[in-house]
Amino acid sequence: MSDEADEAYSVTEQLTMTGINRIRQKINAHGIPVYLCEACGNPIPEARRKIFPGVTLCVECQAYQERQRKHYA
């Protein structure tokens, strides 16, 4: 029973995050700055947003994503 509840929670969480990310992408597509990381939800520092306009990931998540790409490349 616990496994079913865990799976339902996981699916619900995934659907929620997908919806949130779609909204963030629409906002970003209209030139409104994204202040929160799309992966973890932490704030993206202003200096990073100025240096990399349109950035959607914080430094930590960007580094993680780049490591994953190297690992699978």
From Swiss-Prot:
GO molecular function: zinc ion binding
Pfam families noted in UniProt: zf-dskA_traR
Keyword hit for Zinc-finger: yes
UniProt KW Zinc-finger keyword: yes
Gene3D superfamilies, per the entry: DksA, coiled-coil domain
Annotated zinc fingers (dksA C4-type), start-end: 37-61
InterPro entries with a match to the protein in the record: Znf_C4-type_bac, Znf_C4_TraR, Znf_DskA_TraR, Znf_DskA_TraR_CS
Protein name per UniProt: Protein TraR
Annotated NCBIfam families: C4_traR_proteo, PRK13715.1
Source organism, top-level taxon: Bacteria
Keywords of this entry: Metal-binding, Plasmid, Zinc, Zinc-finger
Protein's organism: Escherichia coli (strain K12)
Gene: traR
